[in-house]
Amino acid sequence: MAPSDLSSDLLARNRVILMHFDTYSASLSFVCWDDSTVLWPDALPDWSDIPAPADAASAAYDGEAVRQALIARYSFNPGELVRISNFDHWAQTESGPVRIHLLRFNTFQAPKALLEACDGSFQNLPELRRADKQELTLLRQVFNLFIGGSSKG
């Protein structure tokens, strides 16, 4: 999935949840990739939540680099995609820690056609109820962040 100039290590150590939040209607939707996962570039194999590792500040987990990789891969408008820095989640996999980032389209409407051209589709939580249980737990945390009274990101 990644362009040849992107580090495979960067993509192996990071995942992205891509979402849109309509502040007018309080509608929250997530991008589901290939009708199978909400994590970009791939679903995670078996994993468990962990606290941030000691090397969390290293370039291997840089949220802006991950954001730029997604923008480069799909030619997204950089001004329309923001990183939600107060969403900071980590997963332990067989190959090591993976950071999970949250990126939000700040457009008036979700760019559905743009994502459909990238094999993604916007879906709300009820539409994702068959998703991986661990992914649903992450989406619930995003829901709580935006709708449940936490900071609006």
Regions found by a protein language model. Give the residues of each.
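Ordered hydrophobic segments in well-structured contexts
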Residues: 15-20, 26-33, 98-104, 121
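Conserved Nudix-box catalytic region and its N-terminal flanking loop in Nudix hydrolases
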Residues: 11-12, 22-73
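Short secondary-structure junctions
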Residues: 71-81
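Active-site-adjacent beta-strand/loop module that shapes the phosphate/pyrophosphate-binding cleft
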Residues: 79-81, 85-121
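Helix N-cap and loop-to-helix transition residues
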Residues: 61-62, 77, 124, 132
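Short secondary-structure capping micro-motifs at structural edges
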Residues: 4-5, 53-57, 71, 85-91
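Acidic, metal-coordinating catalytic segment for phosphate/diphosphate chemistry
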Residues: 1-24
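Nudix hydrolase/Nudix homology domain
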Residues: 38-52, 110-153
